[in-house]
A protein has these predicted regions:
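Transmembrane helix-loop-helix hairpins at membrane boundaries of multipass inner-membrane proteins
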Residues: 1-8, 15-111, 183-202, 206, ...
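Hydrophobic alpha-helical transmembrane segments
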Residues: 72-86, 202-217, 405-410, 482-503
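Membrane-entry segments of alpha-helical transmembrane domains in multi-pass membrane proteins
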Residues: 1-8, 70-84, 122-134, 269, ...
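Alpha-helical transmembrane segments and their helix-start/interface "positive-inside/aromatic belt" motifs
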Residues: 28-39, 159-168, 359-367, 436-451, ...
Length: 582
């Protein structure tokens, strides 16, 4: 049964993509209907698959000597990621029925979205590193194509190309790691690597560990390779929700969690993961606070929340990281889709041009506030329980300075959350009025996600059991729901974190009385608005690379004689090395 459900989770979206592509552009109603049907069916299949969690390979197809076996494994991490991709993905497709109603090239949009969803499900369920890499690259292509969906907009095209290039840097790290593993044990199977990782030479394991970390940094938009994600905001809003909540950015966190047992003892690796996570959490939160574009603010918020998950993995809290991944997928999809309803109604992303829209859009205001409650980590919302689990574990298992930095990040998160609510829905009305609240299809998705914000934390016990029973190499601490609640209430770190969050709210409330403090912080504000110079740093690397390539270009004379000399000389060197047994 699990074989069928896994194939349906991956294959149904891909089958839908093919059928929709073959329909042609004129069958718009049919495209909406089929995209919804196939995505929802895949979501249902993934939901049922949660009941078949196992660490055994249930589907194996031999692909020959060089490619190894294509395997699918329904373990806890895989079925969980597949469920997020397909269920949240199906809600974005339902939302798109209204949001994309007037858009041209609807066929291309739905085909790419469904291909994206299926690839993400395949990435999670794959038992082979090589085929995980294949699905990894398909998601990269889909993100590029969807970010560049409005291909007559130079900013959208540039954003898509940037996302593709940066994430390909991470893909190189994953591919190198996979090839090294194959060279060591003769297999691409993830289970084989986790079983034999302790036998690897230290320098080989270090190469794999930091290669996978580089892959995660690029894919999950962590500092310093985070700059592609804010530029991805040129995509249609359902696409940004898909990228930021249900699909691609989750892949890097999943990669680190998947291979944590094999890599955790590599010298310097866990502290590197912690530092990457806390820098991303703090710096991105500050950039979200300084942003006036609602979608860019939410993009920086995504980077920050992913930083919490990466930090959690660095401290060994694999369960907490994945639990927060679930919470974040829900409340961030809710926030992006709510913001999309606002943007479509008022025609701008600039929060400075909004204000008092809550009177015109009471439904959207309510669901956006629900999303911010979860983002800020207030009690009763899923974000509270998952974030507090991370902070509680970090209090015990990470350096104290790292824990304090994450606490500060929690306060900044509360600050920019209330800032977004205030600028969009309250205060003085600017020169924009909303034309509608939210059409029916949008309301279905937004209502479902709002309900999930208040209920998914009840799955903590079942989710913990799923992971612990199907991940033999991981040490998963399981808690029942009542134990989770009592544990968090009793933990001093919980109350300290809530105090920091409260201080964040107070800062915004008292902002007019703190103008002198804001004046003293102006250098930090300017640095934040400049993105802390990461874009300039990345551009500097590009310029150095271009300069080096111009030097190497001298060797390309274009003369056949010299080309033949180079080929023959290189062949002689290779043959000599082979003869010496190198």
């Amino acid at each position: 049964m699990s074989n069928l459900l896994m194939l349906l989770s991956i294959g149904l979206p891909w089958l839908g993509a093919i059928i929709i592509w073959l329909l042609g552009e004129k069958q718009r109603k049919t495209q909406h209907m089929l995209a919804t049907l196939f995505s929802v069916a895949a979501g249902i299949a993934s939901l049922f698959l949660l009941g078949f969690g196992s660490n055994q390979v249930t589907l194996r197809i031999s692909m020959g000597r060089y490619f190894g076996d294509f395997t699918l494994i329904p373990d806890g991490l895989g079925v969980f990621l597949s469920a997020i991709a397909t269920i949240v993905g199906s809600l974005t497709v339902i939302y798109s029925m209204d949001y994309m109603r007037k858009e041209a090239q609807l066929r291309r949009y739905y085909a790419l979205v469904l291909l994206f969803i299926g690839a993400m499900a395949g990435l999670g369920l794959s038992g082979s590193l090589l085929f995980m890499f294949l699905f990894w690259e398909i998601t990269a292509f889909c993100s590029y194509a969807l970010i560049s969906f409005h291909n007559d907009d130079p900013k959208a095209v540039a954003g898509g190309i940037k996302a593709l290039i940066v994430t390909q840097l991470g893909g190189i790290g994953l591919l190198i790691g996979a090839m090294v593993i194959r060279a060591q044990i003769g297999s691409y199977q993830i289970h084989d690597f986790l079983m034999h990782a302790r036998t690897f030479p230290p320098h080989i394991l270090s190469l794999i560990a930091f290669g996978f970390l580089a892959a995660a940094i690029a894919k999950s938009a962590q500092v310093p390779l985070h700059t592609w994600l804010p530029d991805a905001m040129e995509a249609p809003t359902p696409v940004t929700a898909l990228i930021h909540a249900a699909t691609m950015v989750n892949a890097g966190v999943y990669l680190l969690a998947r291979f944590y047992p094999a890599l955790s003892d590599v010298p310097g690796w866990t502290i590197s993961v912690i530092v990457v996570g806390l820098l991303s959490a703090i710096l991105a939160a500050l950039m979200a606070l300084a942003s006036n574009d609602v979608k860019r603010a939410l993009a920086y918020s995504t980077i920050s929340q992913l930083g919490y998950m990466v930090y959690a993995i660095g401290t060994g809290a694999v369960f907490a990281s994945q639990f927060h991944l679930l919470s974040h997928s829900i409340f961030k999809a809710l926030l992006f889709l709510s913001a999309g309803a606002v943007i479509q109604s008022v025609g701008t992303r600039d929060m400075r041009a909004m204000g008092s829209l809550g009177k015109d859009m009471p439904f959207v205001r309510t669901v956006f506030i629900i999303g911010c409650i979860a983002l800020a980590g207030l009690p009763i919302a899923n974000g509270f329980f998952s974030k507090e689990l991370i902070l509680e574990h970090g209090f015990v298992h990470s350096p104290r300075w790292a824990y304090l930095c994450m606490l500060i990040g929690a306060g900044i998160t509360a600050l920019y959350s209330v800032r977004m609510i205030s600028m969009i829905f309250y205060g003085e009305r600017k020169y924009i009025e909303a034309t509608n609240d939210a059409p029916p299809a949008m309301r279905v998705s937004l209502s479902t996600l709002s309900l999930a914000v208040f209920t998914t934390w009840l799955m903590a016990g079942a989710f913990g059991n799923l992971l612990s029973n199907s991940l033999p190499f991981h040490q998963i601490q399981t808690l029942k729901v009542d134990e989770l609640v009592l544990d968090l209430i009793a933990a001093p770190s919980t109350w300290l974190a809530l105090l920091i969050v409260l201080i964040g709210f107070l800062f915004w409330t008292l902002r007019t009385r703190l103008r002198s403090l804001l004046g003293a912080l102006q250098p930090l504000v300017s640095l934040t608005e400049a993105g802390f110079g990461f874009e300039q740093m990345n551009q500097g690397v590009v310029q150095v690379t271009k300069h080096l390539s111009s030097i190497l270009r001298i060797t390309q004379t274009g003369q056949l004689n010299w080309n033949v000399v180079g080929i023959v000389g290189g062949l002689c060197i290779v043959l000599t090395l082979l003869a010496w047994g190198v």
